Amino acid sequence: MTTDTIVAQATAPGRGGVGIVRVSGPAAEQVAEIVLGKLPRVRYAEYLPFKDEQGQPLDQGIALLFKAPNSFTGEDVLELQGHGGPVIMDMLVRRILQIKGLRPARPGEFSERAFMNDKLDLAQAEAIADLIEASSEQAARSAMHSLQGQFSSKIQQLVESLIRLRIYVEAAIDFPDEEIDFLSDGKVAGDLYAIMAELDGVRSEAKQGALLREGMKVVIAGRPNAGKSSLLNALAGRESAIVTEIAGTTRDVLREHIHLDGMPLHIIDTAGLRDTLDKVEQIGIERAWAEIEQADRVLFMVDGTTTDAIDPREIWPEFVDRLPKDIGLTVVRNKADLTGEDLAPSQELGHAVYRISAKTELGLPALREHLKACMGFQGNTEGGFMARRRHLDALERAAERLLVAKDQLEIYVAGELVAEELRLAQESLSEITGEFSSDDLLGRIFSSFCIGK
């Protein structure tokens, strides 16, 4: 248990109708007596003045006192709900910090204390931040499911299955002289395959949850005047980029964040790529390449009125040579309203090819479906949970350990090695909920939270 008491504004900075200051720790009752002049009844809302050091009212509002362990943090907690002006909030926090033993809360420290006091696990704590940062209704619902423990429950079920299997395997190791060969009787293999299948299902759900949180970065690239900015505007549904007939109009990177069926898509329009003596345009082109090299997918825009080619290497071999091999490339032939070409998508020389008109939006629905498929979108995410990159990494490590355990069982019938791989898989899964996590990992996670959360 911590011995110090922390304070911070729990509501967002800025002006609002209501602002909340939260205090957590053993001195919460002392703060109440000093600032309120009395100890409020536990878990009852009382309308009281908030007093300065001279006993004069700073503000008046609702005071709520929670006693450990029945609070968000598991400690004594005092919440003061006053008027949400930034000056009032700052005065109230500074007044509380004058009390001996009080200090400002670090980012995420209230959630960290809730985790340390077993009020929620690590995945649930992260879900609080994800719920606040949700950029769509689907993302908010998924974060709420994680906060309610849906993701953690699935992980706990996997961990418990691994523990039961480990007990069985280790019993076979400890009693090798029994008439029955426990490692070869089919139970271990059957249970292991069932756990692997269950883990695959959780991994698939987690990938969808990570997509809801992180989305996909798509860069629109190509020669000047190919229609890149027009495509950005069409996908965004508004005039985000200036469009003219003058080559080189876009000189800097333009960003738009849209949602396709709830999945966030980060679209980036770049300067047209060409050799130029214009210093400003050169800077824009270098920035364009910096974005291209970090993309999840590149939409390679081609002016369909200038060439019939669909192979990007034929259109621009230097571009293909410079593009990192692990980045997906989609050829987008623009101005189909002028060329009259068939809009049917095709697969040519390892690249998807889409014919569109960014101006009239011909072919755009098919391109949107293609982008969803590139993200790995699997349809309705209702009932899913939110996941982060570290969760996917932990699930991947667990799956790798189980594959090794499968080989150790099937090829070598090595009980000790099977048990060790099961232990390592369990350890990886336990990192997700925080049952097995280093202090450094916890510090990185909670430091990314808002102050007051």
Swiss-Prot record:
Q: Which residues form the TrmE-type G domain?
A: 215-376
Q: What is its main location?
A: cytoplasm
Matching entries from InterPro entries are given as: G_TrmE (IPR031168), GTP-bd (IPR006073), GTP-bd_TrmE_N (IPR018948), GTPase_MnmE (IPR004520), MnmE_dom2 (IPR027368), MnmE_helical (IPR025867), P-loop_NTPase (IPR027417), Small_GTP-bd (IPR005225)
Which residues participate in GTP binding? 225-230, 244-250, 269-272, 334-337
Q: What class of enzyme is it?
A: hydrolase
Q: Which SUPFAM superfamilies match?
A: P-loop containing nucleoside triphosphate hydrolases, TrmE connector domain
State one Pfam family annotation.
MnmE_helical
UniProt record, GO biological process: tRNA methylation; tRNA wobble uridine modification
Cofactor stoichiometry and binding remark: Binds 1 potassium ion per subunit.
- Positions of (6S)-5-formyl-5,6,7,8-tetrahydrofolate binding: 22, 79, 119, 453
Q: Which residues bind K(+)?
A: 225, 244, 246, 249
Q: Which UniProt keywords apply?
A: Cytoplasm, GTP-binding, Hydrolase, Magnesium, Metal-binding, Nucleotide-binding, Potassium, tRNA processing
**Cellular location(s):** Cytoplasm
In the record, what terms sit under GO molecular function?
GTP binding; GTPase activity; metal ion binding
Q: Please provide, in alphabetical order, the Gene Ontology terms of the cellular component aspect for this entry.
A: cytosol
Name what cofactor the protein needs.
Answer: K(+)
Enzyme Commission number(s) of this protein: 3.6.-.-
Q: Which residues bind Mg(2+)?
A: 229, 250
Q: How does it assemble?
A: Homodimer. Heterotetramer of two MnmE and two MnmG subunits.
Q: PANTHER family per the record?
A: TRNA MODIFICATION GTPASE GTPBP3 (PTHR42714), TRNA MODIFICATION GTPASE GTPBP3, MITOCHONDRIAL (PTHR42714:SF2)
The UniProt function text for this chain reads: Exhibits a very high intrinsic GTPase hydrolysis rate. Involved in the addition of a carboxymethylaminomethyl (cmnm) group at the wobble position (U34) of certain tRNAs, forming tRNA-cmnm(5)s(2)U34.
Family according to the record: Belongs to the TRAFAC class TrmE-Era-EngA-EngB-Septin-like GTPase superfamily. TrmE GTPase family.
Protein name, entry field: tRNA modification GTPase MnmE
Lineage, broadest ranks: Bacteria, Pseudomonadati, Pseudomonadota, Gammaproteobacteria, Aeromonadales
